[in-house]
Design a protein with these regions (language model features):
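Cytosolic juxtamembrane helix and N-cap/initiation of the first transmembrane helix
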Residues: 1-23
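Membrane-embedded alpha-helical transmembrane segments of multi-pass integral membrane proteins
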Residues: 17-27, 51-58, 79-86, 111-121
């Protein structure tokens, strides 16, 4: 049962998204001179960084319910978009009093965009599976 789940490329995409979402929690996403914006610096960022890996990891196990899996992935993409917007907006708001050259964005800011692309690829793979199952049902 689980062997067929792991062989699906969209399951691998979703697993990579889960891993990336968890790893960005351990690194600061911006430097503001003497302080850094991190995972625990805001309850909104904390909440999004907790919900996204849980939703994407849960979506892996709904491989038999492809429509629900696509909905979970779409919901996850929306959350990732909010996370990326929040990270960038909080940096620009917090960096207003920062001196030139002392404020920097780090690599974790790019991760939500990578996650969105991988999740979109997973949705496409799930849709292909659903189309293949429906075509097989028509032949029966």
């Amino acid at each position: 049962m689980y062997k067929t789940m792991i062989q699906r490329i969209q399951s691998i995409y979703l697993f990579v998204v889960t891993i990336l979402s968890v790893t960005i929690c351990f690194y600061p996403y911006a430097s503001l001179g003497d302080r850094e914006l991190t995972y625990s610096s805001s309850p909104i960022y904390y909440g999004l960084s907790t919900i996204i890996p849980v939703v994407t990891f849960a979506a892996i196990f709904f491989f038999r319910k492809r429509i629900l899996q696509m909905r979970l992935c779409s919901f996850s993409i929306i959350l990732m978009l909010f996370q990326a917007i929040y990270m960038i907006a909080s940096f620009f708001i917090a960096s207003e009093g920062c001196k030139e050259g002392l404020c920097h964005l780090y690599l974790p800011v790019v991760v939500p965009f990578i996650n969105m692309i991988l999740t979109y690829l997973a949705v496409r793979g799930i849709a292909k599976d659903e189309a293949m199952v429906r075509a097989a049902d028509r032949l029966r």
